[in-house]
Amino acid sequence: DCRNSVVREETGSEIKNNEKIREDSPCLVKIPLFLGGFKKRSRYMKEYQNISHGFGPVYNRESRILILGSFPSVKSREQAFFYGHPRNRFWKVLAAVLKEDEPETVEEKKEMLLRRGVAVYDVIEQCSIIGSSDSSIKDVVPANLGIIVEASQIRKVYTNGKTAGKLYRKYQDKELNLPMEELPSTSPANAAYSLEKLTEIWSRAIVEV
């Protein structure tokens, strides 16, 4: 019976009922690492990678506020746009603040931001990071936010979460010299804040739009 016979190509371990299977056994089934995925993901999530931001800010001449995250998550880097994780509540919260329908596509998100005077980017342009872990960030190269501010009407900065706020104060505050308010993170990792609570706090803070 070959039903329980499996080998993982990346480890070379062959097990059937706790016994070794010969390499030439007809029961041997090889599962490549890129299909199994577990060890590859584990290594990826545990290793530092030095990564550039990968996509540009959203703003125009009419932008009045700037919302900053820390650095794009893995999902955002894959989609080449902000807050790409399906459980991140940024777009739900911002749409509620602006009294807009929640945008679904990247183009709809851009259109809403530009029409409502909201610029979005991140504090960091390049860094070493493990996966999406803000706490692992090191080797920081700050983003050139001055370009955004000079080409717009931005008068206030909001940071999405404590890490973004901390990084902003360390790398950007003196350069931009704008009022900044730190808002609770919309990340799914911030489980202490419900969608309703986030929306309430963000709505009280953001009045310029």
PLM region descriptions:
Residues 3, 7-9:
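Residue-level detector of structural "landmarks"
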Residues 12-24:
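Short alpha-helix boundary/capping segments
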Residues 25-28, 35:
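Short hydrophobic targeting helices and cationic amphipathic motifs
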Residues 33-44:
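Short, Lys/Arg-enriched N-terminal segments with co-localized hydrophobic residues
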Residues 64-70:
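Short, hydrophobic/glycine-enriched beta-strand segments
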Residues 75-136:
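Short, surface-exposed acidic-centric catalytic microdomains
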Residues 115-163:
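Internal catalytic-core helix/loop-beta-alpha segment
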